[in-house]
Amino acid sequence: MMSELRIERWSMPAADLGPEDPLPPLRGEGDFLDLEKIPGVPDEKLKSWVDGNPPNILPYTRQNRFTRQRHPRDFRIAVLENEFLCATFLLELGGRLWSLVHKPSGRELLQVNPVFQPANLALRNAWFSGGVEWNIGIYGHSPFTCSALFAARVERSDGTPILRLYEWERIRQVPFQIDAYLPDGSPVLFVRVRIVNPHDGEVPMYWWSNIAVPETPDTRVLAPAGSTYRFDYRKFDVISVPKAEGIDVTYSSNRTRAGDLFFHIPDGHRPWISAPDGEGKGLVHVSTERLAGRKFFCWGMGLGGRHWQEFLSEPGHTYIELQAGLARTQMEYLSMPAGAEWSWLEGYGLMEADPDVVHGTDWTQAWQSVEDMLERLIPRAALDAEFERGADFVDRPPVELLQRGSGWGALERLRREASGEAPFCSEGLVFDAESLGEAQSPWLSLLHDGAFPAFKPDVEPHGLMVRAQWRALLEDAVSAGRGANWLAWLHLGVMRYYARDRDGARRAWEMSLEEADTPWAARNLAVLAWEDGRFDEAVELYVAACRLRPSLLPLAVECGRTLIDMGRPRDWLGLLAELPPSVRTVGRIGLLEAQAALAIGDFESVQRIFAEKPVVDDMREGEKSLSHLWFDFHEQRLSVTENIPIDDALRARVRREFPVPKQFDFRMTSDESTSSG
């Protein structure tokens, strides 16, 4: 058959993603790894990490109002197909490559999640497992992983259809594009990626293509390397492969805990990674040299890791991840020069190698056998030539726009036109006026009319902006009295906070509160008070904000966490009684109630909540709050009832006699002997 691109529907049970959180993510804790506290990280990687990480995820907001109730849903997909492969992309969910079927054998090369179930694993909170995710800009999954990208049909000179996925990334302020295509007769899916830095200065850059493949006991991950960086979220070290401490770490079935292996592929060597099963068959990923990093992630065989696999999907659908990135590890950023354009070509196909060699005891022979078969599948010279041919279509305008993404790229295009700046992208990326929506509407008014419009205070604000150019426009408008309303002051406070002008932010939010008594300004002022150690004021402001919007779950959760952190559990329990049942019955709220109850010695309430088996929809990756609460509860209960101190002996006894029930165990490391207290 001839290569084709078509639009279809993919049906699966899906949880509701819910609306975005209207609260700006001012507090960046938990967004990024605290790498400075992890031993073994090389100095140069640590420096690029510290220099490259933003203080928070602004201007993005969190996607944290999803549920775990699933219902049948049809997703819009793009399908690329030729005689060898059929590739399916979820257009509404970050352009995720969801399925890649090798047609002659009928083999699915990726792990296809049978459900869409968001969980709290990404910077914006919501993330889902399965397929191939395109991660740009910052560590912690793409800001677009649960959002629609622009999608367009482009055609090569020979008529081969190309699926172009693209967006404007707002933290690094760069456009990126993904051109996926399947030429006639190709046994490999090609994915050509381009990132452009349109600025006059350097930009910290990050890209990782994360590939989920089925996990089986006999699947082995191979790459052309004799050593790796190992990162288990507690330490960072170098180990030899395949064996470390007597264990063959290239099989996930041998690894007890979650962790990453970053392969040391020599400079100049062809970068690839593959996961053949016991028959020597599985996905192989290869690229041109720009995409130099390769990583193997697994959840581990521990109870917590197994629980996470089920939490993200359904029993029996476990996966591991093969990943490919610009840098050698994910603990670093590369400095992208001013005006630079970075491009590379990725290939995805079926590896068929000799299983006896692939799973043999000679590691070098094992990976060399895969490399030999890769050279037959897609020779290195052929991949390089295919990449060079991409210059012919990379700037070609779309034949058809299949889907629009956000309106932020169009707004940036209009701002640049108004200020006389050069365009940030070629005609190959269309950010049209039709993509502009409610989030961009007030900023468009500011740009064209010089005034910021107001909306009703009871409507959830959205459309955050932190760029200096927009702040200057808003500062000028407000100082001149053009739209100095509650919403303008609210946004200006966020901009000042982002620019580390805390006093200015406080004044702006106080002005917003004078204009309208909103939970939005009260909450932002509460964050400032908490950060400054003005706890009495923070409690008062948080309680006021919650009373103004008692049905807003993210506000209630943040309020509960903060009041407990400040040592005010009784204030939280008192406020909890005022919240509506739709909030009080949520699993996260139940966890916070139990933590507060334990803090005041109310063992009966803690026991009742555990008996209700709360499900915390937004359990964070690496979070141990449930298991810590379980251990702390039993330690304190036994200490009181038996009049004994909480010491190492009691902690050990609790872990023996009261193991964490499976539904509460999300631990990713083997530190069961430690306690939160």
Which residues make up each language-model segment?
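Acidic, contiguous internal or C-terminal segments within carbohydrate-active enzymes
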Residues: T67-Q69, E81, A87-S105, L165-T216, ...
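Extended, loop-rich substrate-binding clefts of extracytoplasmic carbohydrate-active enzymes
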Residues: D43-E81, S129-V188, P217, L303-E332
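Short Pro-Gly-centered flexible turn/kink motifs
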Residues: A78-E83, F89, A152, V193, ...
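A contiguous, surface-exposed recognition patch within enzymatic or periplasmic domains that forms
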Residues: M2-L46, A78, L85, E92, ...
